[in-house]
Amino acid sequence: VLSLLTGGGGNANYWHWLFDVLPRLFLAKQVINLEEIDFFLFPSLDQKFQRETLDILGIPIKKRLSSRYYRHIAANKIIITDHPYILKNNPIKEIEDLPLWISEWLKESFLKINNKSEVLSKKFYIDRKDSSSNHTSLRKIINEEELKKFLKSKNFDIISLKSLTFANCVQLFNNAEFIIGLHGAGFANLSFCKPSTKIIEFRITPGKMYENLAKINNLKY
């Protein structure tokens, strides 16, 4: 059994799934053939994006275990990895200093699904109205409707990422030239942007995780 368990964020949060959970597959692959793994233990498999990413990565459904349903397991061998980036027990600092290899692995793994035949927005605002985050009540723009009206006048589309498939999100961000949004997990998709894509993030917290993610990917934040 390969354990991909992580902190609580991996249960449902898009960011933590992409940066805390899935990169463990890359780490494990450095020392073992993943085809030899009998089962992969995940924090959760309830979210659509979780199942979609595993389909793309070729993890067979019959080998996927969710810790929400398998609370205790016994195995002849359990394989675990280090956390992909929290290595010094200082998560607040380390989440702002992400290693480039994670973004590069995400690109390598998921940009291959890009279907360039579809016409997509090049300039868009991320609408969080459908967000299931526990922080939604704390993260909001008081005059958001006024902001949306202004952005529409500048030919920005208003897009809810939750309404898209994972493959659509990858394609959308890879095609984008200008992205605006409120601090949230959707900015994890900055890993899929082309260099020089323009980014404006509204945030009320001091955290620089998305700012630094943009910078290591050579985006204009």
Report each predicted region and the residues it spans:
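The feature primarily captures lumenal catalytic ectodomains
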Residues: 1-221
